[in-house]
């Protein structure tokens, strides 16, 4: 029996979320609520694709369509959402034999490609898989250009004391000094999102991207997921907020999502302390992994993130053009991606 595709509807959201929960690669970004928030804030149309064999689900594939001028661009995830990855999920992937994994994924991707061509009539598509979804061959075999990317994940299953011992010695010294100088870390509220949104916008400007106000987007994520799956940590020094981060919590992993803006303070390291306090919180809350989200495409970020002694975790970006004409416009697409985020 071949795989068929179905566009999920609002009444399918609990069924959809169950499939995300049942996939070893499912992330909070794949959940129905998060997808709808992203659709709202990115000027995109969501296509939540269900893959079925008969009535049995085999996977999901969230896609976002954006129309720009005369082009139809498909993303998973879309620009301007500050999501590193999304892409397909296969149900019970870790429980399948390798031959079964391959046959399902290959057919699922072929069906998806047919849908992109016949129904969406795409000109460009970019898919970014979630961490540890390591089989990129079905993309390669169907004409995609594939690029490896990397995020950072710390094993915190043995507790905060072991995590602390594994840190770079200099980081431990900097954290202790920052505490002695009087920087305090606390859990933040929705009011702290204004500081974080402004800091993130400034950082994008510094990196050559167009400024964007993420306040309403972050507010919606906060209202949908706080406190169970969304936390804020902020650092204060001499009565002022000097740093902060947002933490997404799903399954066994807590992930540093947005935050840790560059600070001009000399001799103290509030971002290091905030990361450490959020790691301790994650340990105490029963999480087994702490992710410092990264794409691995900006070497400037390596120095900050690697000093916490994380492990590299592989994921992929796969992209494809509908024809050589649009392939020839690659520089235009690259410029569009840069200015849109």
Spans of features found by a protein language model:
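A short, internal acetyl-CoA/4′-phosphopantetheine-binding micro-motif in the GNAT/acyltransferase core
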Residues: 85-100, 157-158, 259-268
């Amino acid at each position: 029996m071949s795989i068929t595709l179905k566009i999920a509807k609002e009444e399918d959201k609990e069924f959809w979320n169950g499939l995300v929960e049942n996939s070893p690669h499912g992330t909070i970004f794949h959940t129905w609520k998060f997808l709808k928030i992203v659709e709202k804030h990115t000027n995109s149309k969501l296509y939540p694709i269900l893959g079925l064999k008969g009535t049995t689900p085999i996977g999901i594939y969230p896609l976002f369509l954006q129309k720009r001028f005369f082009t139809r661009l498909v993303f998973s995830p879309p620009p301007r959402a500050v999501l590193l990855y999304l892409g397909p999920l296969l149900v019970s992937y870790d429980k399948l034999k390798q031959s079964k994994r391959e046959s399902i994924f290959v057919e699922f991707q072929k069906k998806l490609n047919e849908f992109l061509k016949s129904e969406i009539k795409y000109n460009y598509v970019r898919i970014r898989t979630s961490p540890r979804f390591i089989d990129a061959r079905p993309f390669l075999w169907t004409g995609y250009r594939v690029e490896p990317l990397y995020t950072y994940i710390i094993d915190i299953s043995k507790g905060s004391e072991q995590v602390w011992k594994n840190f770079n010695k200099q980081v431990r010294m900097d954290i202790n000094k920052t505490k002695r100088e009087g920087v305090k870390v606390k859990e933040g509220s929705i009011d702290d999102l204004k500081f974080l949104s402004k800091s993130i916008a400034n950082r994008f400007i510094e990196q050559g991207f167009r400024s964007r106000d993420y306040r309403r987007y972050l507010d919606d994520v906060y209202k949908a997921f706080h406190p169970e799956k969304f936390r804020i940590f902020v650092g204060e020094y001499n009565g002022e907020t000097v740093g902060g981060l947002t933490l997404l919590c799903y399954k066994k992993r807590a992930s540093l999502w947005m935050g840790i803006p560059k600070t001009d303070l000399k001799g103290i390291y509030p971002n290091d302390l905030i990361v450490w306090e959020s790691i301790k919180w994650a340990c105490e809350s029963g999480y087994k992994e702490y992710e410092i989200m990264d794409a691995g495409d900006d070497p400037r970020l390596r120095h900050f993130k690697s000093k916490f002694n994380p492990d590299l975790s592989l994921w992929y970006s796969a992209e494809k053009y509908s024809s050589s004409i649009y392939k020839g416009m690659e520089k235009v697409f690259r410029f569009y991606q840069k200015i849109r985020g």
